Design a protein with these regions (language model features):
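Active-site-proximal loop/helix segment associated with metal-binding centers of metalloenzymes
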Residues: 1-50, 55-66
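Histidine-centered catalytic micro-motifs
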Residues: 52-57, 89-99
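Binuclear metal-dependent phosphoesterase catalytic core
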Residues: 63, 69-89, 97-135
Length: 135
């Protein structure tokens, strides 16, 4: 946990209740949000369901050069079973600054992140300004 806090920029910059956001607070927020997603999925009668989160919903879309990193828990949560068990048309995510799409049990897991423009990540990571999603 300490290594994650030292290596991730967000851990040194995000304030919560007038102090740096701590892992425990983040985990509480994560649990609250995940419960909301689960409840919303269970109650939805919508024809199409799209989930949008900041973080990666599966390790399947972690960049190859980050596979196995101890820092992955700061970027992704393995929700592959949740995705497979629900009728989600698409899950749109961000945070990783790499653009990797996947499909899990018919669900499109997609992103189109610019990343840090001042570091030219939008060029290196294949940001597509005209990209769109068809359901």
């Amino acid at each position: 946990r300490r290594q994650r806090q030292m290596c991730i920029r967000d851990s040194r910059q995000i304030m919560y209740n007038s102090k740096l956001l701590q892992t425990e607070e983040f985990n509480k927020m994560h649990s609250f949000c995940l419960d909301f997603i689960k409840q919303s999925l269970a109650e939805s009668t919508a024809k199409h369901i799209v989930v949008v989160t900041h973080h990666l919903p599966t390790l399947e879309v972690v960049a190859p050069h980050h596979k196995g990193s101890v820092l992955n828990s700061a970027f992704a949560t393995e929700l592959g079973q949740l995705i497979a068990d629900n009728r989600i048309d698409a899950w749109i995510y961000g945070h990783s600054h790499t653009n990797i799409d996947a499909e899990i049990n018919g669900t499109k897991v997609v992103c189109n992140q610019m990343g840090y423009v001042f570091e030219n990540e939008h060029i290196a990571n294949g940001f597509e300004p005209g990209k769109f999603l068809v359901l």
